Amino acid sequence: MNRIDLPPPAAGGVVLSWPGKAPPTFPPPKAPRLVETFEPQRLVTLQSAPPANRLYYGDNLDALVHLLDAGYAGRFRLIYADPPYDSGVEWTRKARLRTTLPRELNGVVIEQPQYSDVWSPGAYLQFIYTRLPLLRELLAEDGSLWLHCDHRRVHHLRCLLDEVFGAENYLNTITWRSQTARGAKVNAFFFPHSAHAILVYARNRAAPTRWRPQRRRIELSENEAAGLFMRDERGFFRTSDPGTYSFERLKQLHAQGRLYAPYGGEVIVDEAQRRVYASKGGNLGVKYYLTSLGDGRYQVERGVDNIWDDIPGLGTTPGEDLGYPTQKTEALLERILNAGSDAGDWVLDPFCGSGTTPAVAQKLGRRWVACDASYGAVQTTVRRLQAVCQQCSVSASDSRGDAEGRLCASPEGFAVYAFDEMRPPQESVGKIDLAITRIEGQEATIEVAVLDADIPFARSLAAVHPALDWRAAVDSIAIDPAYDGLVFRAAMADAPLHKRATVSGRYYVRAPAAPTTLAVRIVDIAGGESMTTVRIEA
C-alpha cells in the first residue's frame, strides 16, 4: 500500500494533542480468507465467484489496508462509522430463549462479552486517528463520512476530523435524539444525556459532495391539524409566498383553487394590468394541502434539518432489538444512506456491530462492505443479512416488499472473510438428527428435516419445562447442498429476527447432481455453532 500523507494543517488551525500521539502507521496488507457465502437458492461451486458484498471478521485496520491494496481507493460514496465512544463500559450481548411459553422463560439466559470500550489515556484518540486517513482514501471525491459519537468525545473527534479531512470539508453535525429520558434518569445531574452526534465530512466539498435533501412525513389527528393549519372546503392547508411566479402561473394556481387572499378577501385577476392580487390587501399565498389518510388522520411533509428528533432509538423500537449492545435503528441508517448515496453506490461500515448498515444497504440496493472484530457481531450480522437477503430474493421474484412494505432492491447475497482463525464458539450444539429425502422432478430437490439438536442449556431447561424443545434455543439454521469442506456456501437459511419466532426445521433446497455432501449448520442463541454433513450418493 502506498504511503498516506495527512493534509498540511490550515493556517491558524487547531491541532489536538494527547498522551502518546504519533503519526498514523499501518500494517502491511494481509489476504483475508473466504469462509462463507450466502446466495439464496443458488447452486454455487468452487469455481463460482463470491458475491461482491462482503463482511470482514477481524481488526478493521487490516480490512481498510486490504481494501486500499485491493483497489477500493475512492470507491465508497458513503462511509458510516460508529466506533466505540470511550464509554468505560465492557459491553455484553444478551441472549434470550425463543419461546411463547411463560414470561419467566423469555428472560435473559446468558450475557456474553462482545467488546471492550475501556481505554488507557490517549489510546482511544490514537485508535481513531490511525483509521481516519484510511477512511479518507477510500471515499469517492464526492463522498461523505458520517462519524457517529456521543457527548464524551464529539469535541475531540471534530478536531481530529478537521486535521485529517480538512476543516473546509466539514459539512454539519447531526444531533439525533437517541432516547427519551425516563425513570430516575430524568433527575440526572445537570440534565440527562439523550442525544448522539453524527459528524459529517466531505472528501472534497468542492466536488461537490453527493447530496439528496430529505423530507419527513408527519401524521396528525384532525384536532392537531386544526390547531396548526387553515381549512377550506378542500381540506387543511398551509400557505407559502408565491415569490417570482409569473402572471400565467398565478392564473393557473387560481384556477386550481390554490391561491389564498388574507383578511377574508378575494383573489383578483387583472388581465389588463397582468397582475393578480388580494382584494383587501396583504400578500397572496399559495395553498399546500395536507394529505388525507382517512379516519380523521392527515399527513404533512416537512424538510429535515440537523436536529433529528423524529427517528426513535432502539428503546422505542423493540421489534428491531437483536440483543446486541449499542445497536442503531434502521430508520436512522435509511435517512443517512438516502441523503448521501444512490442505488448502486458502494457503502462502507468499518464498525458494523449488529449489521444495521449492511442490512439497510441491502434493502436500498446499495453495494456494501462491513467489518467487525467481534465474532458475536459477525454472527449477528450474518443472521440478520440472511433474513434480509431471503426476503429481498422473494421481493425480487414477486414484487412484494419487506415487513414495512418497502421493496427490497437487492436480491444479491454476500460473502464473509476472516483475517484470523474463526474463534471457536463458547458452547457448541451437540448431536443433530436429520432426515434427508431426495425428490426428483424438473429440478432435483432435497428435503431436509431437522428432527432434534442437542443444546446443553435447552436440555437443562426442558427438565423443568417439558414443552420446551430445541427450537427455542436456536438462532438460525443454514444449509449448503454442495459442501466442499472448506467454504460454507449456504443456499438456504432460516434466520428469524423476531425475538419469539422459531426456526421451522423442515426445508427444501435445490440439489446438485449426486454425489454431493450436504451440510447443515446450526447457531444457538449463545453463539454456539455445530455443523453436520450427510453424503448423498444418489
Residue ranges: model-predicted function:
Residues 71-72, 132, 138-140, 165, ...:
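A generic alpha-to-beta junction signature in SAM-dependent methyltransferases
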Residues 59, 371-373:
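Conserved acidic E/D residue at the C-terminus of a beta-strand in Rossmann-like folds
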Residues 134, 139-145, 343-344, 364:
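Short glycine-dipeptide loop
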Residues 54-55, 314-346, 352:
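Glycine-rich adenosyl-nucleotide cofactor-binding module
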Residues 74-93, 161, 347-361, 370-371, ...:
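Conserved proline-anchored active-site loop of SAM-dependent methyltransferases
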Residues 84-127, 142:
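Mobile active-site "lid"/loop adjacent to the S-adenosyl-L-methionine
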Residues 56-74:
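Conserved RecA-like ASCE ATPase "motif II neighborhood" in helicase/translocase motors
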Residues 1-37, 41-48, 52, 69-73, ...:
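Accessory, often C-terminal, charged low-complexity segments
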